[in-house]
Structures are given as C-alpha cells and as structure tokens.
C-alpha cells in the first residue's frame, strides 16, 4: 500500500461491508441500545489491508507525531489533608496527531498518503452511522494515536459539558492497528458504577466504538520480550456528533435501504 484508499469501505472485510450495507443485525444499531455504551469487534477490517495500513503509518507518520505526556500530579498526594480523600485527574502517555490542524507536519504527511481523505470519506461516516443506529453530523473530528511500550490512558470519561454540541454525548470510532511485537493492551470500562468490563484492544484491524461519555481507561501497552522498540498500536479515530435523536429503525427499511445510507447526510 502506497496510499490509503479514498474510501474507508475499501479497507473492510466482507463482514465490515455487511455492516456498511446495514445487513449485520448484531452490530447495526448496536449503540442505539441505551444500555450499551461500548462495542469491540474483530474481523471487520481486511487483515491484509490492516497490515499494509500499519506499515504505511510507520513509514509516513511516526516521525511527525507529538508526544502527549500528562503524569499524575505529585500534589494528588502532597496536598492531601484527609484520609481516603484521593482525587485523580486524567493521566496519559502516547503520541498523537490532530489531523484537522493542517499546518502541522503530521497533518501534511497524513494528507500526502491519503489518510485524511479516507477518514473524512462518506463510507467512514456511514460505517459510524451504522454502528450508532442514528443520524450523525457530516463533519467530524479525525485523529491518529500511537501507543508504544508502556503508553496508556488513565481513567477518564470524555464528558464535555462546556461544549453544547457534545454535552449530551457523542460517538468515537477507533480502528486499531497493533504490530506483532505487542503482547497485549486492554480497554477497561465501567458498568453499573464499577470497572468490571475488559477487552484486549491490541488487535490488527479491530474496531471499537464508544457512546460517550462513560468511565474507561486503557492499560499500559505490553510488548513481547525483547521487542519493546517495535511494539506499537496505531489508532485511527473519528469523533462524531449526533445529528438527531435515535431512530427506532436501526435495521434495514422494507425497501432494503440500510440505516447508514438513510442517515449519512446530516
């Protein structure tokens, strides 16, 4: 792969294409269920395309990423005056590129290899709409993350109450591209107020979707012994705002039109 395809659909496997067409009943509209906040699914991205995409990212973007490193503030301990009065702001370490910042070197590199166009494509928006089971606004945020050995994101909820468009929730869709040197990295999320749910996200082409806000964290990436320098997990990320309340129709209409097609234009 010399460039990313113009359409996200061209990365998908047959199962992924079925989601896009509204024919995968288990996944289409899954996040319209008010009891469900998160889904993780493998096999939706073609394995060969996933490997090629990861190699392309290594060559084109790795050198241009920005490091995000927000450690736990020491005053969370030194300023404590009462027993059991702990507080923990979001702590994290990873590398990233915000692709909307077009003057940045990473954004320019992403544009040159077609990544920005693919993440802004109609089919990526339609794929997200199919999982959400509801209308999404057409313009969405795009970002790339890269976790190396030991990189993580601590407990956080991604709630943005000061932003009117996102205050009542929004959708994140992540495409995971882990190298063979990665042993594991887990996503842990809260259910009924407790961190009881866990899934390994160190996949090559796995898809995760988040109906935010909810509490979750990403564990430190663990490399296979002796392969720390080669252990990376890329994440292609889209952030989508809701365009309308959820529809009761999350499955294909009687005429066969998939939800993704009906709601792709907000």
Where are the regions a protein language model picked out?
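Catalytic core of Fe(II)/2-oxoglutarate
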Residues: 2-6, 145, 150-151, 157-161, ...
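Non-heme Fe(II)/2-oxoglutarate
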Residues: 2-125
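Conserved double-stranded beta-helix
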Residues: 68-188, 213
